Design a protein with these regions (language model features):
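N-terminal, polar/charged subdomain of small-to-medium soluble alpha/beta proteins
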Residues: 1-131
Length: 131
């Protein structure tokens, strides 16, 4: 006789995410000549969904997504070169974020704040997830 073990039913469904709201950086971005000569204010909003079943461990920072490190990396990446398009910048940010195995999905919104009069901002919003 074969004994079948049933999986223990979970009591909760977890969803974990790291959020970075309204990170404002002065960077070179855009296709126009005036955008290539002067930095402009760009706002970043990032939502990173992580593996909900990797539980945070106070003694191991690799068990979490460190938002301070993410802010630093976005700033460094954004200032590395002139980005012609926000779409190009967003792909570079996605590539950097998905190097962390804990990252499952990223929602990224990048906005130029002062570029078009009569608007608060213009920009892009993109979601990308691992398959």
């Amino acid at each position: 006789m074969k004994i079948i073990k049933f999986k223990k039913k979970e009591k909760f469904k977890y969803k974990r995410k790291v959020i970075i709201n309204d990170l404002i950086l002065n960077i070179f971005v855009g296709i126009h000549n005036f955008e290539k000569k002067k930095k402009q204010r760009v706002k970043f909003n990032v939502e990173i969904l992580t593996n909900p079943y990797v539980f945070p461990n106070n003694k191991d920072l690799k068990s979490i997504i460190n938002y301070e490190e993410i802010v630093y990396k976005i700033e460094k990446l954004s200032n590395l070169k002139h980005h012609e398009l926000l779409e190009d910048l967003s792909e570079n940010i996605f590539n950097m974020l998905f190097q962390n195995k804990l990252v499952k999905k990223v929602n990224l919104k990048i906005e130029k704040i002062d570029i078009i009069k009569k608007t608060k901002s213009v920009g892009i919003e993109v979601s990308k997830s691992k398959i």
